[in-house]
């Protein structure tokens, strides 16, 4: 519904019409930058569950003869959100396209975790300006985490007024209404909720592939690490009910999926918001391991919530994979305190020791930030020493990127960028060294590989992943795609393994 229609329907008075620069009418709450103080108040509000999602008949057929294109940036949660939006588009009658030139609607599903991710999005918006000029009927939308930031919305309003639609992470289920308004309105349509949404079940999905599937188990994060924008862009922790998750996993198993990954900004906090029962991630994993699906992973973990019961359940093995991504961020207790991670170096190492005792062959990977405000040489050396002590299989490493509205962004930073880059290089040298050492141990071994498709570099070579998430390239028949096979490793590289398929595909019982 556009402004004129709203006035005619009596929903607003003409005198209430805002000036061109005042878009507050589109926001459910007052439009302000992320606030740590206000965000922490949110835990008092009850989360509501909705199992009756339906697309109104008035919107069905909206997409007949039209095509949509979604470009996804960032984490697995964004990929999952894209699957949901694609499902809604298809239910509206749209067809997918891989080309922006063929699309009638283009959505950029954005990431706000680092400045570099935001720059990529703004670069893409700039590239699409010419396309929009040539095709004025094209609907160009920006959604995802960046849309939850005041500075981003203001920048789009000021510098990219040709964008038609902006919506956030909490109202994806309102995509039909938002598209309808974008078609009718002559102004930019903006709907960003400061308050996080409820848990909406039965949303349609168009999954990418039939081999591996994402299963969202919770939304949001309440940890408020001082450097992180996610608690503001994704809202408070809200867990899906276990029965809904179990039903979804059973359905994927029946459809022939070989692997699922449980998703959440902090999966280890799963269930902590339930008021009617004591039920955590360990309980959920214990139920899921009984389902006839070969592989179950989860990401991402927070060390603070990684409890003994979860370790006990994971140690049962079976379809619960012994690959754990456990972000440490820094090896210095002082830096961890400034980050508000709520654990120190010793506690993290104790957790690692518990995991390795229960699962001696577990593969551990991590995330590390270098160049946090005022990080000293000694504190950085502590990160290097912790990495060597744990011997992670691999790591995602980053230079600290300040995010507007977070406490860390207000800290005075005396670490020059030159020093930050040098530290990142030194850390990556250690990461590569230990990864190469770990991969070398696979030479001569036979490993189970879930074959995902042809290698990106050579169509005559197949590629897949081991139970411990190691990339394997090997020679084998195309019929093996989508199957579990045994591969003998001949050569180890820093980040991948080369081998040859041995025997037939593994029968999954």
UniProtKB/Swiss-Prot annotation:
Its cofactor is [4Fe-4S] cluster. It catalyses: N(6)-dimethylallyladenosine(37) in tRNA + (sulfur carrier)-SH + AH2 + 2 S-adenosyl-L-methionine = 2-methylsulfanyl-N(6)-dimethylallyladenosine(37) in tRNA + (sulfur carrier)-H + 5'-deoxyadenosine + L-methionine + A + S-adenosyl-L-homocysteine + 2 H(+). Binds 2 [4Fe-4S] clusters. One cluster is coordinated with 3 cysteines and an exchangeable S-adenosyl-L-methionine. HAMAP family: tRNA_metthiotr_MiaB. The keyword Transferase applies. Monomer. Residues 440-503 form the TRAM domain. This is tRNA-2-methylthio-N(6)-dimethylallyladenosine synthase. GO terms for molecular function: 4 iron, 4 sulfur cluster binding; metal ion binding; N6-isopentenyladenosine methylthiotransferase activity. Residues 66-184 form the MTTase N-terminal domain.
